[in-house]
Regions:
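Short, polar/proline-rich extracytoplasmic segments that appear immediately after membrane translocation
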Residues: 2-71, 239
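Terminal low-complexity, poorly structured segments
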Residues: 2-5, 131, 170, 175, ...
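Solvent-exposed, conformationally flexible loop/turn segments
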Residues: 67-75, 147, 186-190
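Residue-level detector of alpha-helical transmembrane segments in integral membrane proteins
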Residues: 1, 22, 139, 150-151, ...
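Surface-exposed interaction patch
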Residues: 25-26, 74-159
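C-terminal, structured domain-capping segment
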Residues: 76-91, 95-101, 172-239
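N-terminal cationic leader/targeting segments used for protein routing and processing
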Residues: 3, 124-127, 185
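Extended amphipathic alpha-helical interaction segments
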Residues: 152-172
Length: 239
């Protein structure tokens, strides 16, 4: 007899709980994001080098999936290992590849152009166990797809952009970004660099970024979206 009445009671309790969550989501932008969105999925980081051949560089933590399934406000780090095998003291500078139409594809909805790179900021680059930030980028240039400083109201990114031309973001004038000044490496020396990225939470519901790498509706794929960058180590012999 008890089970006869217990099942309806549990069902009613669950229904009531789900109703409360739905009502809270409607009136809370941040909670609304987590209640109504899945996650952002995107590509990640790779690494290459230019200059002296006898060096090693590899991503040892993070990397390919660093931007996958991020949520607003979430921070993630990637660690790069660099070693000097040249037999001479060297210097290197860390750069990041420029945004392109291939690396920063767009999702268009109701005339608004959504680029995930405008939401992701490189907060810092730290060497080894140091707390010192070696990142030389400032302001809007810290975002993976930079806009004008004025477009980041209060330092927060927009949720969407509307371009008068109807052609989306103009990538033609962008070049790769230098992330650090020259870093010295003695013979045989090995160091690590840790880069911290943040999906900046601007307090708005960001529904355009649902399953960013495979934004689909039913069987019809609306867009195959992407966010990726290459870290570039420029090596040279120290004078």
């Amino acid at each position: 007899m008890k089970s006869k009445y217990l099942a309806p009671l549990i069902s009613a309790s669950l229904t009531g709980f789900m109703l409360i969550v739905a009502l809270l989501a409607m009136f809370s932008p941040t909670l609304g994001w987590f209640a109504t969105n899945k996650s952002v999925s995107a590509s990640g980081l790779s690494v290459t080098s230019v200059g002296i051949p006898k060096t090693e560089q590899e991503i040892i933590d993070g990397g390919e999936d660093i931007f996958a399934e991020m949520m607003p406000g979430e921070r993630r780090s990637v660690t790069l290992r660099v070693k000097n095998l040249s037999g001479k003291p060297i210097i290197f500078r860390l750069h990041m590849s420029a945004p392109t139409e291939a690396s920063d594809s767009v999702y268009v909805e109701d005339g608004l152009w959504h680029y995930f790179g405008t939401q992701v900021r490189l907060n810092s680059v730290k060497i080894g166990d140091s707390d010192t930030d070696s990142l030389i980028l400032e302001g809007a240039d810290k975002y993976l797809l930079p806009l004008e400083d004025s477009q980041y109201t209060g330092g927060l990114p927009p949720t969407a952009l509307e371009f008068d031309s109807g052609d989306g973001y103009d990538f033609s004038s962008l070049s790769e970004s230098q992330l650090t000044d020259a870093i010295n490496l003695a013979i045989g020396e090995e160091i690590t660099l840790t880069l911290e990225f943040e999906f900046v939470d601007n307090g708005e519901v960001q529904n355009a970024y649902i399953s960013f790498a495979d934004h689909s509706s039913g069987d019809a794929v609306k867009a195959s979206l992407n966010l990726s960058r290459t870290l570039i180590c420029y090596f040279d012999f120290a004078e």
